[in-house]
């Protein structure tokens, strides 16, 4: 193993593919600590909708970057990058392996490569113009502009993530480069000795699992969880733009029946899974492992362990 570069395991994959359970099994065997690579699990009191791991499921494996922010607080990829790099150093010093687990591709990528999140390639005047467009015509209008000019970024960035949509347009306007080209220009080499594992699944099977997971979330009390945030007056915040929250907000505000909101949630979750896979395949050099049932989880764990051991020279 390259001793100058700390070892890091990264386990990625779309929502509902089975990352959580497998990550704990691997962490137990590898003496690893898990860092959440999900941009929404950072928020307190947002447990069901973000599919946050329960304490009893952790099996004593330390988990980081969960429940660190109030739902009213914003959180950026630059902040994530800084905190996670500190965590990796801390875990490495303890003689344990850091394992990043999640589905927010840009967040994970920002940690692994030496991306700079300064105001380089910034144009405050253009940004203000786009913000005015968004306020006047809606987030979808600005996202459609991005879709015309940088389809890949548009697929990776949710329309309601206004700040990131505008930033992608700003980079294009200032540099003439797409978001990916701009980041590729910064992407010299990995900062860590990295074993990058991806879990995938046949699309129809994955979509069925997503639909079932949404039904399970509703049974577990997702509507009550969202209503608590709504009653706390958590509005127009980054946190409740998350899938699972904005759809049920539409119901609570009388813009959709509960049945319509749940169907929209399922559809948005399926689309998000598709965007996640597109991002990972286009942006990252991943060793993919198929989790389509029937799958022998112990055998799959062994295959992944063997890959990690070879990659990190364990």
Curated annotation (Swiss-Prot):
This protein's record includes keyword Nucleotide-binding: yes
Reaction(s) this enzyme catalyzes, per UniProt: adenosine(37) in tRNA + dimethylallyl diphosphate = N(6)-dimethylallyladenosine(37) in tRNA + diphosphate
Site (Interaction with substrate tRNA): 104, 127
UniProt-listed Enzyme Commission number(s): 2.5.1.75
GO molecular function terms noted in the UniProt entry: ATP binding; tRNA dimethylallyltransferase activity
Transmembrane segments: none
Residues that bind ATP: 13-20
Positions with a binding annotation for substrate: 15-20
Cofactors (names): Mg(2+)
A Pfam family: IPPT
Family membership noted in the UniProt record: Belongs to the IPP transferase family.
Listed HAMAP family: IPP_trans (MF_00185)
Free-text function comment from the UniProt entry: Catalyzes the transfer of a dimethylallyl group onto the adenine at position 37 in tRNAs that read codons beginning with uridine, leading to the formation of N6-(dimethylallyl)adenosine (i(6)A).
Protein name per its UniProtKB record: tRNA dimethylallyltransferase
Species name: Bacillus licheniformis (strain ATCC 14580 / DSM 13 / JCM 2505 / CCUG 7422 / NBRC 12200 / NCIMB 9375 / NCTC 10341 / NRRL NRS-1264 / Gibson 46)
Gene from which this protein is expressed: miaA
């Amino acid at each position: 193993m390259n001793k100058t570069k700390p070892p890091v395991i990264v386990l990625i994959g779309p929502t509902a593919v089975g990352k959580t359970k497998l990550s704990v099994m691997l962490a137990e065997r590898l003496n690893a600590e898990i860092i959440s690579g999900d941009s929404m699990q950072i928020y307190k009191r947002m447990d069901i909708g973000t599919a946050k791991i329960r304490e009893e499921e952790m099996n004593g494996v330390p988990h980081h970057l969960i429940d660190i922010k109030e739902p009213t607080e914003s959180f950026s990829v630059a902040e994530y990058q800084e905190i996670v790099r500190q965590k990796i150093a801390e875990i490495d010093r303890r003689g344990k392996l850091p394992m990043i687990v999640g589905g927010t591709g840009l967040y994970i990528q920002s940690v692994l490569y030496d991306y700079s999140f300064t105001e380089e390639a910034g144009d405050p005047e253009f940004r203000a113009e786009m913000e005015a467009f968004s306020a006047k015509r809606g987030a979808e209008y600005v996202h459609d502009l991005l879709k015309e000019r940088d389809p890949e970024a548009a697929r990776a960035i949710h329309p309601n993530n206004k700040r990131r949509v505008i930033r992608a347009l700003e980079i294009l306007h200032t540099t003439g480069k797409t978001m990916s080209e701009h980041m590729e220009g910064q992407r010299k080499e990995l900062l860590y000795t990295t074993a990058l594992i991806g879990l995938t699944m046949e699309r129809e099977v994955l979509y069925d699992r997503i639909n079932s997971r949404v039904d399970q979330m509703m049974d577990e009390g997702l509507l009550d969880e969202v209503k608590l945030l709504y009653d706390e007056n958590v509005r127009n915040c980054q946190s409740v733009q998350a899938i699972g929250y904005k759809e049920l907000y539409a119901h609570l505000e009388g813009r959709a029946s509960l049945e319509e909101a749940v169907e929209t949630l399922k559809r948005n979750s399926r689309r998000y899974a598709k965007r996640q896979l597109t991002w990972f395949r286009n942006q990252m050099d991943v060793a993919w492992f198929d989790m389509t049932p029937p799958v022998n989880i112990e055998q799959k764990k062994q295959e992944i362990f063997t890959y990690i051991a070879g990659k990190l020279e364990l």
